[in-house]
A protein has these predicted regions:
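N-terminal loops that bind phosphate or other acidic moieties
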Residues: 2-131, 135-363
Length: 363
């Protein structure tokens, strides 16, 4: 009689190709003889809204707002009771722009402010904010401008901001720990990915520093060097500085909401992964958080990714296996094709499980 094992799948998205839910579903097809459980997960970046809404059983609603180039769009967020789930990239995401439209200097987070206004009008007072995937490096200035326009200049600093700070709770879901400015700041580390030239990086970093200095003088405190202030182009800073937000690991926040540790108890194996796995994976990305919890529960954990670098470091960290799903020599263009990724992911999962349960993958 064949023994059936419980396999827990908890994948981050494969950026530009498959969402978290899609990756998990396809991988599970390679485990057809096993009992599988697929979790839709995110660390606060891409796919955050879908994953968190599912975990918190929130309804997705939408409103009119503006993208990073101030073009009118409809953007979604989650709402359950008095809690709103906001994915900043829904309003000012890099994925909303064509590559030739990226404007690292002019991109604005104004639309995020519009999402907040709509959620507040619907009664939201508790907020989970997913930071990541934005096209902006404005330190949250655009978001604050939208709130300023809504509240009016007379009320903004005197009554509106204090109410947001004192009557609402703000939880930032992110695993980014960079400060607002400096060598490890939002501009230096993330702006090049958003199309910034070296000269623009210098300009943006100086602009963020001026923004923080002005706020510190006016408010008497400075959050610019706090871990996570540089997340989402400095939106993290704006929430920390102006709203008194609390930064939490996006991955841990979601895994707790999914009761992940309980789900682990009867699992024979956990399989996690992301589009590209390397030593950065071990610096707080979602697969690392999955690994930590699996190790604590004494459940083996394997990693699958579209690309794998620093494999020995990944194995040394505790992954039982770390595999690239694509064969050697496959072009980057082919790797990003959805059907190619689906086929290779399902096949690699099947091969991994065969090896694992035949005891070919040792501790």
């Amino acid at each position: 009689m064949t023994t059936t094992h419980k396999i827990l799948f908890a994948f981050d998205s494969f950026k530009g190709c498959l969402s978290s839910a899609e990756v998990g579903k396809v991988a599970a097809e390679g485990a057809e003889q096993e009992k599988v459980e697929v979790l839709n997960v995110s660390d606060g970046g891409d796919g955050m809204l879908s994953a968190f809404c599912q975990a918190y059983r929130a309804e997705q609603v939408s409103c009119n707002c503006h993208d990073a180039l101030m073009r009118p769009i409809r953007a979604a967020y989650g709402l359950v009771g008095d809690m709103a789930i906001i994915e900043t990239a829904q309003a000012c995401g890099l994925s909303l722009l064509e590559s030739n439209e990226r404007d690292a200097v002019g991109g604005t987070s104004y639309g995020v402010g519009e999402l907040l206004i709509d959620a507040l009008d619907r009664g939201a007072r508790r907020f989970i904010i997913g930071l990541g995937g934005t096209a902006t490096t404005d330190g949250g200035f655009g978001m604050l401008k939208a709130l300023y326009v809504h509240a009016g200049p007379a009320a903004f600093f005197d009554t509106y901001l204090p109410r947001l700070r004192n009557e609402c709770s703000w939880t930032l879901a992110s695993d980014v720990r960079n400060p607002l400015y400096g060598p490890q700041g939002a501009a230096a580390v993330f702006a090049p990915q958003k199309g910034a030239t070296p000269a623009e990086v210098v300009h943006l970093d100086a602009r963020l520093q001026r923004l923080a200095q002005h706020a510190a003088r006016r408010m008497g405190h400075d959050c610019s060097m706090l871990p996570g202030a540089g997340a989402a182009g400095g939106l993290g800073y704006a929430f920390l500085q102006y709203f008194g937000a609390q930064m939490q690991s996006g991955a841990d926040l979601l895994l707790d909401a999914l009761d992940f540790d309980t789900r682990l108890r009867d699992a024979a194996l956990v399989i996690t992964g992301e589009g590209s796995a390397d030593k950065q994976t071990l610096m707080g990305k979602l697969p690392w958080h999955v690994l930590q919890r699996a190790q604590k529960a004494h459940v083996p954990c394997c990693l699958l990714a579209g690309e794998v670098s620093n494999r020995e470091e990944l194995l040394k960290a505790g992954f039982r296996e770390a595999l690239c799903i694509h064969p050697a020599g496959l072009s980057k263009e082919e790797q990003l094709r959805t059907e190619v990724t689906k086929n290779n992911l399902s096949l690699t999962t099947s091969q991994l499980l065969t090896r694992f349960f035949n005891a070919e993958i040792k501790e």
